[in-house]
Amino acid sequence: MPKLEMMLLVLLIFPLSYFIAAGGQVVQVDRRGDGLAGYLQRGDRDVQDCQVSTPGSKWGRCCLNRVCGPMCCPASHCYCVYHRGRGHGCSC
């Protein structure tokens, strides 16, 4: 088998092993440093998207619990409610 064909075959098989090792789920490698957001959004965690501090910035606040308005709820069983005159808040 020529070298080029062998390299192409290896390149085709190599990513497949990662796919199988992950249990058949697509594994997305994040090389920009936003891996924490991807980690928090996996599984059955009750995680909302990170809130961006300033428009155009990738920095913000990530919560392990539900995001409600500008804050994170203190526990995973809390949910976000709207209080008339006071705005949004967590109800636990």
Swiss-Prot record:
Distribution of this protein across tissues and organs: Expressed by the venom duct.
Cysteine-cysteine disulfides: 63-72, 68-80, 73-90, 78-92
Keywords: Acetylcholine receptor inhibiting toxin, Disulfide bond, Hydroxylation, Ion channel impairing toxin, Neurotoxin, Postsynaptic neurotoxin, Secreted, Signal, Toxin
Cellular component aspect of the GO annotation: extracellular region; host cell postsynaptic membrane
Signal peptide boundaries: 1-24
Post-translational modification summary for this protein: VxXXA stands for the form with the Pro-55 hydroxylated. A second major form has both Pro-55 and Pro-74 hydroxylated. The two major forms VxXXA and [hydroxyPro-74]VxXXA exist in a 1:1 ratio. Minor forms are [hydroxyPro-70,hydroxyPro-74]VxXXA and [Pro-55]VxXXA.
Subcellular location: Secreted
Source species, domain of life: Eukaryota
Propiece span(s): 25-45
Modified residues (4-hydroxyproline): 55, 70, 74
Gene Ontology MF terms in the entry: acetylcholine receptor inhibitor activity; ion channel regulator activity; toxin activity
Main location: secreted
Function: Alpha-conotoxins act on postsynaptic membranes, they bind to the nicotinic acetylcholine receptors (nAChR) and thus inhibit them. Through its two C-terminal domains, this homodimeric protein would bind to two nAChR allosteric sites, located outside the nAChR C-loop of the principal binding face and at the adjacent binding interface in a clockwise direction. This toxin specifically blocks mammalian neuronal nAChR of the alpha-7/CHRNA7, alpha-3-beta-2/CHRNA3-CHRNB2 (IC(50)=370 nM) and alpha-4-beta-2/CHRNA4-CHRNB2 subtypes.
Domain comment quoted from the record: The cysteine framework is XX (C-CC-C-CC-C-C-C-C). Displays a mini-granulin fold, a structure composed of two short, stacked beta-hairpins connected by two parallel disulfide bonds. This newly described fold is derived from the same cysteine connectivity as knottins (ICK fold). The name 'mini-granulin fold' comes from the structural homology with the N-terminal region of the human granulin.
Family: Belongs to the conotoxin D superfamily.
SUBUNIT field: Homodimer or pseudo-homodimer. Three dimers exist: homodimer of VxXXA, pseudo-homodimer of both VxXXA and [hydroxyPro-74]VxXXA and homodimer of [hydroxyPro-74]VxXXA. These three components exist in a 1:2:1 ratio.
Name under which the protein is recorded: Alpha-conotoxin VxXXA
